[in-house]
Amino acid sequence: MSKGHSLQDPYLNTLRKERVPVSIYLVNGIKLQGQIESFDQFVILLKNTVSQMVYKHAISTVVPSRPVRLPTASEGEQPEPGNA
């Protein structure tokens, strides 16, 4: 896993697994709402009444509807060097 994805992937995966409704703000100001169905290095699949593939380079902010707890190192995640 590259260093740039050490926070992004677990965060998005937690939102996906817990089916947390999210608001995604795009760089042009548009707000999208739904649940994260899937994601990869370049896109997020957002499901509402329809599924939308949103390119990550177009995303400004991802806002969950409720607080989420990320897995800690003691729950199976390996800490990044220097972040322990």
UniProtKB/Swiss-Prot annotation:
Pfam families in the record = Hfq
Task: Cite a single GO BP annotation.
Answer: regulation of translation, ncRNA-mediated
Q: What InterPro entries does this protein's entry cite?
A: Hfq, LSM_dom_sf, Sm
Offer an example of a GO molecular function term for this protein.
RNA binding
PROSITE patterns from the UniProt entry: SM
Q: Name one GO cellular component term.
A: cytosol
**Which UniProt keywords are listed?**
RNA-binding, Stress response
| Ranges for domain Sm | 9-68
Q: What is the purpose of this protein?
A: RNA chaperone that binds small regulatory RNA (sRNAs) and mRNAs to facilitate mRNA translational regulation in response to envelope stress, environmental stress and changes in metabolite concentrations. Also binds with high specificity to tRNAs.
Q: Assembly and interactions? A: Homohexamer.
Sequence similarity: Belongs to the Hfq family.
HAMAP family in the record: Hfq
Tell me the protein's name: RNA-binding protein Hfq
